[in-house]
Amino acid sequence: GAGAAGRCGAGVGGQLGLKALVLDHSENVAEKVRTSGGGRANFTNVDVTAANFLSENPRFAKSALSRFTPADFVALVKKHGIAFHEKHKGQLFCDRSAEDLIAMLLAECAAGGVERWQPCGVKNIRFLASSPYGSCASSYEIDSDRGTIQCGAVVIASGGLSIPKIGATDFGYRVAKQFDLPVVTPRPALVPLTFDEAAWAPFSQLSGLSLPVS
């Protein structure tokens, strides 16, 4: 996946000396970042804690957030000279555009020598009990639109089903089921209200406003 998570993971891995390759079925990069925050990317919240997450494994959020904190990401944003501001309740937005954040992700990958195959669909992933491709204790083979790839590890960063029109698919769920990982049936958590033209007319001037509701 060539979104924020995939790009961050590949960039960090590459800079730690790993050979990293990013595959994505879409030609675009970080589309969800591009559309978030009204085009300015609400990229983190300085007040977020593990208590803000619901999970069957609460320790995961605590562990993940202790290893890479909002402050760590803010430091990365500052390193790339991206201007930002706090809007409401700890929410941070780019001053100019989400494109600045996407450029940062690409620059971090370039610094790590990350390869990129886009568009490139993944047809199948196979786990090999022992690796014939070097010193790795185990290995994977990936059948892609551009051929077969051998690797020591696979990171699935394909996102969820939230916005199909920007390329979201059920790929991650299918891979999880293939490897017998438990999957909680997904349910919509953030949904729009849709109107036809006549019904929308009285509210059109309210576009772009937000408010807390309960």
Task: Explain the meaning of each model-derived region.
Residues F60-A64, Q91-R96, S158-I166:
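Flexible, glycine/proline-enriched loop segments at strand-loop-helix junctions
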Residues G14-G38:
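Glycine-rich FAD pyrophosphate-binding loop
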Residues Q15, S26-N28, S66, F73-A75, ...:
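Residue-level recognition of phosphate/Mg2+-coordinating polar/acidic sites
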Residues G1-A5, H25:
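Glycine-rich Rossmann-fold phosphate-binding loop(s) that bind the pyrophosphate
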Residues K79-A110:
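Mobile, glycine/GP-rich and aromatic-enriched active-site lid/loop segments adjacent to catalytic centers
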Residues H25, E99-D100, M104-S214:
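Predominantly flavin-linked oxidoreductase catalytic cores and closely associated redox partners
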Residues G38-H88:
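Glycine-rich active-site loop/strand segments that organize a redox cofactor
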Residues A5, G9-G14:
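Small-residue (primarily alanine) positions within well-ordered alpha-helices
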